[in-house]
């Protein structure tokens, strides 16, 4: 009677352990339904719809600086850049510092250039920015100097590029990508962008990743241009830009776009890493050298199936499986000990 009860308890424990093992998830993290099975265009379409934004009122750009994945909405339409122009403007000067053509102490309008860099990027000083491009020979000369930073195809530039302060989203992404991937050419510029506007524009909401950015703001009568461009330090840094034209809630839109693009980048980075990290089957053992004496025939070994490749995402779940399996083994041993002890005492 007692032995029967012990056997029933033993069976119940086995069932419980099997249920625990089956409950272990196949993946350590759930897929994000914002991105799963969606293209970048579809992700952005949902974003614009949720924010009530007319697609004609914005221009967007995105690039992963590691993989080169790149996307645009209205990428080749010229928009008022406002103070975002101070990024390529200072690229001219910082590259001159790097080459030895000038120093950080060279004075511009009474300021050493190091201070002028800070004031134009962190404080967005328009008067000083004007003096910087006038020192280069005037507006048109300055615009000609920044062409290599903005495009690989100078012939594609619209005449408005040289007449006024207009850029496209594609040009700004090209500029930021160059700044990030060849940052040693432009000493100090990204450091100043990291300090700019810690609570506004792309930073209007707290972000999960550090950003280095430069906003652009201009209001003409009832028309309002509020823009931002940034390097976002996700696992694989991305560069993004958003131009807006008289949006009702521009700061929310900017911050939410920044968050969305960072999350999009992380999602696809992790997905790609999982796909690339497949565990390959163990290599076949090297054949043993032939024996010198005639060997006694031995039966051929029974072939075993090679292990199936396992994705990194499944590998991430292995610690959970191992923990449950260890607990299962301990519980099984305990149940077995109790069971057989009962049999001996019977």
Where are these regions (language model features)?
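Bacterial N-terminal signal peptides that target proteins for export
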Residues: 1-12
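Bacterial N-terminal signal peptides
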Residues: 11-22
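A conserved catalytic-loop motif detector
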Residues: 165-221
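Structured C-terminal helix/loop/strand segments within mature extracytoplasmic catalytic/sensor domains
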Residues: 29-57, 70, 78, 164, ...
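Active-site SXXK
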Residues: 68, 78-108, 120, 240
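Short, well-structured active-site flanking segments
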Residues: 95-114, 185-189, 309-313
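Mid-domain, small-residue-enriched loop/turn segments at the edges of structured enzyme/sensor domains
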Residues: 28-29, 72, 128-184
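Active-site helix/loop module of the DD-peptidase/beta-lactamase fold
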Residues: 102-123, 143-154
């Amino acid at each position: 009677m007692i032995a029967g009860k012990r056997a029933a308890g033993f069976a119940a424990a086995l069932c419980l352990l099997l249920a625990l093992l089956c409950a272990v998830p196949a993946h350590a993290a759930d897929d994000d339904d914002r991105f799963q099975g969606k293209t970048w265009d579809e992700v952005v379409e949902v974003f614009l719809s949720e924010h009530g934004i007319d697609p004609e009122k914005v221009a967007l750009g995105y690039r992963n600086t590691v993989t080169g994945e790149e996307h645009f909405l209205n990428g080749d339409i010229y928009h008022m850049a406002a103070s975002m122009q101070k990024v390529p403007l200072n690229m001219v000067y910082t590259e001159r510092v790097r080459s030895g053509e000038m120093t950080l102490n060279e004075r511009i309008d009474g300021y050493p250039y190091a201070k002028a860099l800070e004031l134009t990027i962190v404080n967005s000083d328009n008067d000083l920015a004007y003096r910087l491009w006038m020192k280069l020979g005037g507006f048109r000369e300055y615009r000609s100097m920044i062409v290599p930073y903005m495009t690989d195809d100078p012939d594609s530039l619209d005449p408005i590029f040289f007449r006024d302060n207009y850029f496209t989203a594609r040009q700004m992404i090209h500029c930021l990508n160059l700044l990030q991937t060849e940052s040693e050419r432009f000493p100090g510029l990204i450091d100043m962008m990291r300090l700019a506007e810690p609570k506004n524009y792309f930073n209007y909401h707290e972000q999960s990743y550090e950003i280095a950015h430069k906003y652009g703001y201009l209001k003409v009568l009832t028309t309002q241009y509020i823009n931002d461009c940034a390097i976002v330090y996700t696992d694989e840094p991305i560069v993004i830009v958003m131009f807006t034209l008289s949006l009702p809630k521009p700061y929310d839109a900017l911050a939410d776009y920044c968050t969305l693009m960072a999350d999009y980048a992380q999602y696809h980075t992790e997905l790609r890493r999982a796909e690339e990290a497949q565990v390959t089957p163990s290599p076949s053992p090297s054949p043993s050298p032939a024996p010198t004496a005639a060997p006694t025939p031995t039966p051929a070994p029974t072939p075993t199936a090679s292990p199936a490749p396992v994705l990194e995402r499944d590998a991430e779940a292995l610690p959970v499986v191992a923990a449950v399996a260890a607990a299962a083994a301990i519980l099984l041993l305990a149940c077995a000990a109790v069971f057989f002890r009962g049999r001996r005492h019977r």
